[in-house]
Curated annotation (Swiss-Prot):
CDD domains: RuBisCO_large_I
Enzyme class, UniProt record, top EC level: lyase
Organism encoding this protein: Sanguinaria canadensis (Bloodroot)
Record InterPro entries: RuBisCO (IPR033966), RuBisCo_large_chain_AS (IPR020878), RuBisCO_lsu_C (IPR000685), RuBisCO_lsu_C_sf (IPR036376), RuBisCO_lsu_fd_N (IPR017443), RuBisCO_lsu_N_sf (IPR036422), RuBisCO_lsuI (IPR020888)
GO CC list: chloroplast
Protein name: Ribulose bisphosphate carboxylase large chain
Domain of life: Eukaryota
Length: 436
């Protein structure tokens, strides 16, 4: 027929309701709010087009490739119950659109360009189905849940952590002292705050040295393995790796990274280094609410959590369900399972849009952190189960008798809750009795 220039509706090419999804497709569920007068089919097709092979007009070079093989397809649209003019649009992407082992490229393709789109009032990526064929191109977490338990020799209970406060302003020696007191009192881990990197009042090398000293002293006195999440996040990837190398030379068990501000490329590099050198990797999600807070625009945290499991991390902050940063319980448990389990069934009541098979990619320990304290312990033990890290910052350091007694209180409460649970008592009902 020859080439025919001109602008045509996206839905003629990219809306394909009879498409059968392939096992190798990456599937996305978008919450689409079209501008007034834009039909949902056109909006959904526009998203599929702009995040795959399409552009705003027909181009001559389309004839040089097979669009049928490479285009994203909007294959199903359903209205959102209780919302006016909101639709869930399902889009299937052929696997060949993505570079192997690159979360960076996956996000650049799927969410890189479409969110500023004129035809849409708002757009939110609710979930992704990562096919096993793509999962297998990722190393994933450096070690995973089982290997971590074996390294630490801690079984049958959640792990306990504490963020050292005040987060900024302590000297390295005083910081190390706080670390020692918490670990000595019974915590498994202490943590650098996400914004502790290398500032004038405390340079990273000094902090690493004093924290290592605190760890070894506490280990010698308690006979337990201890750790402190040494934040290796830095302004350049090279500097980040340099800090991780120094941590390894000190012989400490774990380092930490802010994966959203640091970026997925840096995070994946660090995860590879950690696996090669036997370091655990704790991940903080600083900046996540910029992306996931709005209900109708941005990206749901479950997508960021899946991406982290692919990029690599052994722990990730995942909300609390109780405390100051409360999350909706079922939804939170949905992405907690996506982090830990090997296979998760589709379950819309928990916000899970697709069945996800992780094909033995190691699991990530969810970290409950943010405004929780010792009276939340029964609820946390029940909600999160054994494979989790419970992190009390002010809930440890705010104890009227000081840091070490605060740590003791948390450890005693945790042991009491685990014992009561194992004896078959009802934590939800008798929680306060148990820890009193």
């Amino acid at each position: 027929v020859g080439f025919k220039a001109g602008v045509k509706d996206y839905k003629l090419t990219y809306y394909t309701p009879d498409y059968e999804t392939k096992d190798t497709d990456i599937l996305a569920a978008f919450r689409v709010t079209p501008q007034p007068g834009v039909p949902p089919e056109e909006a959904g097709a526009a998203v599929a087009a702009e995040s795959s092979t399409g552009t705003w007009t027909t181009v001559w070079t389309d004839g040089l490739t097979s669009l049928d093989r490479y285009k994203g397809r909007c294959y199903h649209i359903e209205p959102v119950a209780g919302e006016d003019n909101q639709y869930i649009c399902y889009v299937a992407y052929p696997l060949d659109l993505f570079e192997e082992g690159s979360v960076t490229n996956m996000f650049t393709s799927i969410v890189g360009n479409v969110f500023g789109f004129k035809a849409l009032r708002a757009l939110r990526l609710e979930d992704l189905r990562i096919p096993p064929a793509y999962v297998k191109t990722f190393q994933g977490p450096p070690h995973g849940i089982q290997v971590e338990r074996d390294k630490l020799n801690k079984y049958g209970r959640p792990l306990l952590g504490c963020t050292i406060k005040p987060k900024l302003g302590l000297s390295a020696k005083n910081y190390g002292r706080a670390v020692y007191e918490c670990l000595r009192g019974g915590l498994d881990f202490t943590k650098d705050d996400e914004n502790v990197n290398s500032q004038p009042f405390m340079r990273w090398r000094d902090r690493f040295l004093f924290c290592a000293e605190a760890i070894y002293k506490a280990q010698a006195e308690t006979g337990e393995i201890k750790g402190h999440y040494l934040n290796a996040t830095a302004g350049t990837c090279e500097e980040m790796i340099k800090r991780a190398v120094f941590a390894r030379e000190l012989g400490v068990p774990i380092v930490m990274h802010d994966y959203l501000t640091g970026g997925f490329t840096a995070n994946t590099s660090l995860a590879h280094y950690c696996r090669d050198n036997g370091l655990l990797l704790h991940i903080h999600r600083a900046m996540h609410a910029v992306i996931d807070r709005q209900k109708n625009h941005g990206m749901h945290f479950r997508v960021l959590a899946k991406a982290l499991r692919m990029s690599g991390g052994d722990h990730i902050h995942a909300g609390t369900v109780v405390g100051k940063l409360e999350g909706e319980r079922e939804i939170t448990l949905g992405f907690v399972d996506l982090l830990r389990d090997d296979f998760v069934e589709k379950d819309r009541s928990r916000g899970i849009y697709f069945t996800q098979d992780w094909v033995s990619l190691p699991g990530v320990l969810p970290v409950a952190s943010g405004g929780i304290h010792v009276w939340h312990m029964p609820a946390l033990t029940e909600i999160f189960g054994d494979d989790s890290v419970l992190q009390f910052g002010g809930g440890t350091l705010g104890h009227p008798w000081g840091n070490a007694p605060g740590a003791v209180a948390n450890r005693v409460a945790l042991e009491a809750c685990v014992q009561a649970r194992n004896e078959g008592r009802d934590l939800a009902r008798e929680g306060n009795e148990i820890i009193r």
